[in-house]
Amino acid sequence: MERSQCGSRDRGVSGRPHLAPGLVVAAPPPPSPALPVPSGMQVPPAFLRPPSLFLRAAAAAAAAAAATSGSGGCPPAPGLESGVGAVGCGYPRTPKCARCRNHGVVSALKGHKRFCRWRDCACAKCTLIAERQRVMAAQVALRRQQAQEESEARGLQRLLCSGLSWPPGGRASGGGGRAENPQSTGGPAAGAALGLGALRQASGSATPAFEVFQQDYPEEKQEQKESKCESCQNGQEELISKSHQLYLGSSSRSNGVIGKQSIGSSISEYSNKPDSILSPHPGEQSGGEESPRSLSSSDLESGNESEWVKDLTATKASLPTVSSRPRDPLDILTKIFPNYRRSRLEGILRFCKGDVVQAIEQVLNGKEHKPDNRNLANSEELENTAFQRASSFSLAGIGFGTLGNKSAFSPLQTTSASYGGDSSLYGVNPRVGISPLRLAYSSAGRGLSGFMSPYLTPGLVPTLPFRPALDYAFSGMIRDSSYLSSKDSITCGRLYFRPNQDNP
């Protein structure tokens, strides 16, 4: 009775709504007994078949809305969604929080989700609502994915249909297709029917077009691969020819005909195996050195040109070094030191027992040896002492040079006969009380002035006339400053060696 009154009032106020002809239901199906519809509303048939889960939630919402609204306004129809009843009665429906409704509280859902009192409730009703929400969210996501896939399939079908219609008719078929569009805009329903019919016709002819396109595509791809492989091989041949020319130029000076034969063999190997870059020297792989990695066809197809260009440049850089034979150490020394006599360099090399690096160090350090039969006994001692530059430091205002040496015992002697004598090194006076080991192993300017300063005051050591800031050129010889003052000018610049060495 209430339904008929509400329907008559709606009909009197607003009349029958004017809908588009495509949306009007010509013969509505009989409503289900669980879903009565007001007689004054025209509803699409898809809206009349909601899922049962949605119906139960709508019934609960309608009951809650009826309890809160009281007798004001038109009560919603029992069993119908509250949104439909609200639209029919003229006021919009605001969504409510289902968890609050389970606990007897009505609260609007907008901005309420974070501050809901029962957001973490685990009762039976709230868990049921959470499960329903999860199922609904999964359904919505699935429908969105299906709609997206359908739209993509339609776009692909349109592309295939346009690809089919262009080659035979050319522009005319395209123009005809554009001319058919105005006919399809006569009405919404007619346009939809024409669109569906065209899609059905296109779906029937879409598979052969796609097959033809798929057959043509591998041929084009194969042609592209072959052209890329040919260009890559041409580039490799050019680079390898350049590297062989460089190698030929370097090996013609050293090896002559042998280099040409190795180049010919490597070129023949490369022509036999064009898919990979071989090393120009077959013996290089057996010798233990790493050969450049071979290029597979997948690298050539994928366009990895940068890697094989790097490999080719590396092989080109290593070609001259590999081709060079072991050189004579004496030739190396003569090329490094062209101003030195060959016999002199040969003596230094013999003294260093054939070690080129040690011989170069000896020449650079200024150690020139002229070994004779008389000095063979002293050669081992001379080998142990390295001639290094002495670093100068000051002790309580007195500057003298520390004697840098590999051996701690040879540079300093503490005998009393050494003071003032010209047959030995200028030793430190025993009065000073300095251990020669500490003086020899001490570093310049780090800790010597601290432990030496109490002993080297002018009052304690008045008899050590060290020359300030002396810079000794060699560790095996030293200038006698006290002896220089008493000798004449001929012996002033004389250098005193140890007793076991010959004076120059």
From Swiss-Prot:
<dbReference type="GO" id="GO:0001541">
    <property type="term" value="P:ovarian follicle development"/>
</dbReference>
<dbReference type="GO" id="GO:1990837">
    <property type="term" value="F:sequence-specific double-stranded DNA binding"/>
</dbReference>
<dbReference type="Pfam" id="PF20624">
    <property type="entry name" value="DMRT5_DMB"/>
</dbReference>
<dbReference type="InterPro" id="IPR005173">
    <property type="entry name" value="DMA"/>
</dbReference>
<dbReference type="GO" id="GO:0000981">
    <property type="term" value="F:DNA-binding transcription factor activity, RNA polymerase II-specific"/>
</dbReference>
<feature type="region of interest" description="Disordered">
    <location>
        <begin position="266"/>
        <end position="307"/>
    </location>
</feature>
<dbReference type="Pfam" id="PF00751">
    <property type="entry name" value="DM"/>
</dbReference>
<dbReference type="GO" id="GO:0006357">
    <property type="term" value="P:regulation of transcription by RNA polymerase II"/>
</dbReference>
<dbReference type="InterPro" id="IPR026607">
    <property type="entry name" value="DMRT"/>
</dbReference>
<keyword id="KW-0539">Nucleus</keyword>
<dbReference type="GO" id="GO:0060179">
    <property type="term" value="P:male mating behavior"/>
</dbReference>
<feature type="compositionally biased region" description="Low complexity">
    <location>
        <begin position="293"/>
        <end position="306"/>
    </location>
</feature>
<dbReference type="InterPro" id="IPR009060">
    <property type="entry name" value="UBA-like_sf"/>
</dbReference>
<dbReference type="GO" id="GO:0000978">
    <property type="term" value="F:RNA polymerase II cis-regulatory region sequence-specific DNA binding"/>
</dbReference>
<comment type="similarity">
    <text>Belongs to the DMRT family.</text>
</comment>
<dbReference type="GO" id="GO:0042802">
    <property type="term" value="F:identical protein binding"/>
</dbReference>
<protein>
    <recommendedName>
        <fullName>Doublesex- and mab-3-related transcription factor A1</fullName>
    </recommendedName>
</protein>
<feature type="domain" description="DMA">
    <location>
        <begin position="327"/>
        <end position="362"/>
    </location>
</feature>
<keyword id="KW-0238">DNA-binding</keyword>
<dbReference type="InterPro" id="IPR036407">
    <property type="entry name" value="DM_DNA-bd_sf"/>
</dbReference>
<dbReference type="GO" id="GO:0046872">
    <property type="term" value="F:metal ion binding"/>
</dbReference>
<dbReference type="GO" id="GO:0000785">
    <property type="term" value="C:chromatin"/>
</dbReference>
<dbReference type="InterPro" id="IPR001275">
    <property type="entry name" value="DM_DNA-bd"/>
</dbReference>
<feature type="region of interest" description="Disordered">
    <location>
        <begin position="170"/>
        <end position="192"/>
    </location>
</feature>
<keyword id="KW-0862">Zinc</keyword>
<dbReference type="GO" id="GO:0007548">
    <property type="term" value="P:sex differentiation"/>
</dbReference>
<dbReference type="Pfam" id="PF03474">
    <property type="entry name" value="DMA"/>
</dbReference>
<keyword id="KW-0805">Transcription regulation</keyword>
<keyword id="KW-0479">Metal-binding</keyword>
<dbReference type="InterPro" id="IPR046472">
    <property type="entry name" value="DMRT5_1_DMB_dom"/>
</dbReference>
<feature type="region of interest" description="Disordered">
    <location>
        <begin position="1"/>
        <end position="27"/>
    </location>
</feature>
<keyword id="KW-0804">Transcription</keyword>
<dbReference type="GO" id="GO:0005634">
    <property type="term" value="C:nucleus"/>
</dbReference>
<feature type="compositionally biased region" description="Basic and acidic residues">
    <location>
        <begin position="1"/>
        <end position="13"/>
    </location>
</feature>
<feature type="DNA-binding region" description="DM">
    <location>
        <begin position="97"/>
        <end position="144"/>
    </location>
</feature>
